[in-house]
């Protein structure tokens, strides 16, 4: 992989729209891969994509070290299974030119 771009969700959504990348054609982007990191709570925004693709992984976790019960629900931590998913995905896409990663932090 030659380049990794880390951007906000807002910028990610804009890049997808500006480049006319959709769930139907994302796999045609043979030189690019994507990781979409989303919160599990506290947002009315939905992920740009709904399901994993050959070159896309969608993850849901919150900015906590361990699952944490709060007044409104449970914040979910990044876990070992998600770590394995990311590692397997990175191994699978290692020959792609670019990886674009976004997270849903406040932007």
For the regions a language model picked out, list residue spans one by one.
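Helix-loop module immediately N-terminal to the HCX5R catalytic loop
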Residues: 55-100
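Short, solvent-exposed loop/turn segments at secondary-structure junctions
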Residues: 39-42, 64, 106
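Glycine-rich, flexible N-terminal cofactor/catalytic loop recognition
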Residues: 1-59
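A phosphate-binding catalytic loop at a beta-strand-loop-alpha-helix junction
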Residues: 99-107
């Amino acid at each position: 992989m030659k380049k990794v771009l880390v951007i906000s969700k807002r910028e990610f959504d804009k890049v997808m729209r500006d480049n006319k990348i959709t769930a139907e054609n994302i796999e045609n982007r043979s030189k690019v891969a994507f990781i979409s990191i989303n919160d599990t709570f506290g947002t009315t925004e939905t992920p740009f994509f709904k399901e994993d693709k050959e070159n896309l992984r969608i993850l849901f976790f919150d900015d906590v070290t361990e699952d944490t019960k709060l007044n409104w629900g449970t914040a979910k931590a990044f876990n070992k299974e998600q770590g394995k998913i990311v590692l397997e995905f990175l191994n699978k896409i290692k020959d792609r030119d670019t990886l674009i990663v976004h997270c849903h932090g406040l932007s």
